[in-house]
Amino acid sequence: MHCGTHMDAPFHFIPGGSTIDQIPLERCIGPCTFIRLKNCAPHQVIEAEDLEMHFDQLRQRPKVIIETGWYKNWARDNYFSDHPLISGNAAKFLVRCGVHLIGVDTPSVDINPFEAHLEFLSHNVAIIENLTNLERIHSDVFELIALPLKLTAREASPVRAIAVELA
């Protein structure tokens, strides 16, 4: 169920990994760190250095959404082929920060050889892909609610992700 805004469970890449119905719901609800990297170029690689300034926030709020601005290309032919990517080193940095959920406004966090997918999912970090309308979030501090369907033994699920801004 990798269509629209959806969540990947570890089982997507990790044999014997958690399936979508085994993702603890508390990982899907709570304070979130919002990293704005707007206007990323096609094929731009997001490196650990791009994220390091957010270390303290990531330690306090281990859910993270990265805004690249790419979702605005949804109707273009290159949406699925040219999107920005998270490097394996950036994924390792986020795992070291204790992140347990990452969301992006791209169709995938990476491409073959899927270093970011493997790093995240082997450490039980749930991945949300294809987020939209992130420009509507005006605060860098908000509660994320992104619940997957309880689909037994599946590797992914659609989610309805919402940001509840805190005063």
Where are these regions (language model features)?
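Active-/binding-site microenvironments in catalytic and ligand-binding cores
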Residues: 1-167
